[in-house]
């Protein structure tokens, strides 16, 4: 028996909302978004977002609902968006002083994770990602 959540209903609804938005099924996307917000907020009134505002609200609710669960990096990568951080992270210019901002473009090789050596050993045709 596994006693940790693997995937929550809100993640499923938000993923479906994003998929429906991308398929231009805006009414279905809004319906899924409203389901999540209705469960989360006691004083919630049904939303009527549309267009870019709907997409932005889906992304915001996904970020809020799934905070600290390790989804953000993969959400940005899936949407081909850059990573923009303040200077409080681990990247530095070699002086030991963090940069004021840390930016990784969506096309950067730093956006790709290395393939585990055990996987490369298991498949000799596999080539390591450039990073």
Each predicted region: which residue ranges?
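Acidic/polar-rich alpha-helix caps and helix-coil junctions
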Residues: 1-131
